[in-house]
Amino acid sequence: MRIFDAQKRQKQSRFPMKKITKEVYLKWYEDMQFWRRFEDKLAAVYIQQKVRGFLHLYNGQEAVLAGSLHAMDLEHDKMITAYRNHVQPIGMGVDPKAVMAELYGKVTGTSKGMGGSMHIFSKEHGFYGGHGIVGGQIPLGAGIAFADKYFGRKGVTLCYMGDGAVRQGSLHETFNLAMLWKLPAVFICENNGYAMGTSVARTSY
C-alpha cells in the first residue's frame, strides 16, 4: 500500500497547486447552492410526473464536482460520469435550460430530448455523458484519454464513478491499461455509502 503524501507530491509536480482564496470558496458555495436547487427542482417535477424515466440526483456530492472543476482546464480537459449527471455539464458550461429541456424531452435539450435524465451530453463543452450502465463510463473515459494522447492533444479526462461501480470488472481492466499506457486520466470514486441502495458495509468486493 502506498501512502499519498500531498505535500511531497506537490513539490515533485510539474503543475503548481492552484491557490484557494476566499473568493474561490465563495464561488464553490454559490455553484453548490445552484446545483442543489436545480436538483431539488427536478425532484419536484419528477414527483409531478413531468419528467419520465429514472431520476438519479447528485444531492450531497456537490463538493466533489466543485473542487475538481477548479483543477480543470475547461478549454482542453474532458469529463465523463455515470447517471447522476445533471449538474456536471452545467459546471462545464452547458446552459442549465438545455439540461432541463433534455429531462423534459424537448428538442432544445442537450441530446435533442432523446437521452433523458441519464444521458446528458455535450461534446462542445467536453462533457461525454451520462451513462446508464453501472461502470460503463469507466473504459470510455480511458478511451477518451487515449484518443487525446494518440493525437497529441492537450487535456486530461476526469472520469467519475460511484462506489457501486468498483465491483465491475471493467474498472480493474481499465485501471490496468491506464497505468500501462500512462493515460492522461483521473478516476474519481464518489462514495455515497449506498451505491443505489446497498450499504457499503453489506457489500462484498
Enumerate the predicted regions with their spans:
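Short beta-alpha connecting loops at secondary-structure transitions
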Residues: 193-199
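Short, proline-centered helix/strand-breaking motifs
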Residues: 183-187
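Short, positively charged and aromatic/hydrophobic N-terminal segments
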Residues: 3-13
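Cofactor-binding active-site loop characterized by glycine-rich and histidine/acidic residues
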Residues: 40-43, 50-181, 199-205
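Short, ordered loop/turn segments at secondary-structure junctions
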Residues: 84, 190-193
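Active-site flanking residues adjacent to catalytic metal/cofactor-binding acidic residues
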Residues: 162, 189-190
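Hydrophobic alpha-helical segments at protein termini of multi-pass membrane proteins
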Residues: 26-29
